[in-house]
């Protein structure tokens, strides 16, 4: 996103090779950006004027469906967005209303969801806009990432319940500043981005820490030790909260030059925790809580009902289907440990649900994932990596 709106070429070192990344690349290419991904270790990006007609396949990627439409407003011509069946159920209305308020033409037949078409005129005036981003921080990030391209920049005000996953917003602001944007986030729930062209540069991509959750969780379940190399000593990623969470759950967690190491103690303890800043960790944490020695409460995650699937309902149904005792309410989950049994664990085409099922399967014989291939969304090698971890790869 940032490189497509920059002056000059950019490079991405150590990019995440996954379906979500491929969809973002394809979407930008469809709009005119030149991207060379022939080297998995180093992608090269050269910006060009954006134009339609074009069609963007969002798959199930919230980043694609929420980051690219604000940029499409600066293109010339129609850009049509669509995605997987589950993606058509994900909330989009607040972002589409914000774009309309900024003068961008959006045609969604009143759905407030995929599919829709953004018809750009080559420029967006910008100015001020108010949005309720309580369903997803991605609405705000999408607007902020394109704001430097708008003639007057952008002042975005959030009005509504608290924005979830705030570390993602901090990451957005940090990266905008690194790219040369002037961003003022000193006022609560207000972000101001000055207009101006960003500068192409080399980006070193951090490892996706949230994808480490099931592997580190394996140490807690089995009483073993797992090390994830390359864990950054300083990061704004929500996945870094795993260090504190897994300590509370009963693990011994050490961060050093060799990476992050989690050692299991043979015991899992229930927790009472607010996961509003890292809702993506909920499925794996819920799986661990279902195996713990005392009840758990996971709070601040009502927004997960609008993720790849309704994760609160999905976790409740699937864990209870294995004999668990899980209750979902408006804000989160209440989990009371019970002796679990084997059975089919439906992933709902959701990569995080598949990770949760794999964790449960470490402690419960006969757990069958309905669709492990859905992990390709963010980690295509998950099945092989999991087999390697367990020493089961042929």
Indicate residue ranges for each PLM-predicted region.
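Short, structured segments at the rim of ligand-binding sites
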Residues: 1-394
């Amino acid at each position: 996103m940032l490189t497509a709106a920059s002056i000059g070429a950019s490079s991405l070192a150590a990019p995440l090779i996954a379906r979500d990344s491929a969809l973002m690349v394809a979407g930008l290419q469809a709009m005119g950006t030149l991207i060379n991904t022939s080297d998995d270790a180093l992608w090269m990006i050269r910006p060009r004027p954006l134009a339609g007609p074009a069609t963007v396949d969002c798959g199930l990627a919230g980043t694609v469906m929420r980051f690219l439409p604000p940029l499409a407003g600066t293109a010339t011509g129609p850009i049509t967005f669509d995605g997987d069946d589950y993606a058509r159920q994900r909330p989009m209305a607040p972002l589409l209303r914000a774009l309309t308020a900024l003068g961008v033409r959006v045609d969604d037949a009143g759905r407030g969801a995929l599919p829709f078409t953004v018809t750009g005129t080559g420029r967006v005036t910008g100015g001020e806009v108010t949005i309720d981003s309580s369903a997803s921080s991605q609405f705000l990030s999408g607007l902020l990432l394109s704001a430097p391209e708008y003639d007057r920049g952008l002042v975005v005000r959030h009005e509504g319940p608290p924005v979830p996953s705030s570390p993602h917003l901090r990451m957005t602001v940090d990266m905008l500043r690194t790219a040369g944007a002037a961003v003022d986030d000193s006022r609560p729930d207000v972000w101001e981005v000055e207009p101006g062209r960003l500068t192409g540069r080399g980006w070193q991509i951090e490892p996706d820490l949230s994808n480490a959750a099931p592997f580190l969780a394996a140490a807690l379940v089995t009483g073993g030790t797992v090390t994830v190399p390359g864990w950054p000593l300083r990061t704004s990623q929500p996945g870094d909260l795993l260090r504190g969470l897994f300590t509370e759950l009963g693990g011994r967690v050490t961060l050093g030059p060799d990476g992050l190491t989690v050692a299991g103690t043979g015991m899992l303890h229930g927790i009472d925790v607010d996961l509003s800043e890292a809702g993506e960790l909920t499925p794996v944490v819920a799986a661990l809580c279902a195996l713990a020695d005392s009840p758990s409460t996971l709070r601040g995650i009502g927004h997960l009902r609008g993720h790849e699937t309704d994760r609160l309902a999905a976790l409740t149904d699937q864990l209870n289907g294995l004999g668990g005792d899980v209750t979902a309410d408006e804000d989160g989950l209440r989990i009371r440990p019970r002796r679990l049994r084997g059975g089919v664990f439906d992933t709902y085409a959701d990569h995080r649900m598949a990770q949760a099922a794999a964790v449960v399967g470490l402690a419960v014989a006969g757990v069958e994932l309905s669709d492990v291939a859905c992990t390709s969304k963010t980690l295509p090698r998950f099945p092989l990596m999991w087999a390697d971890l367990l020493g089961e790869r042929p």
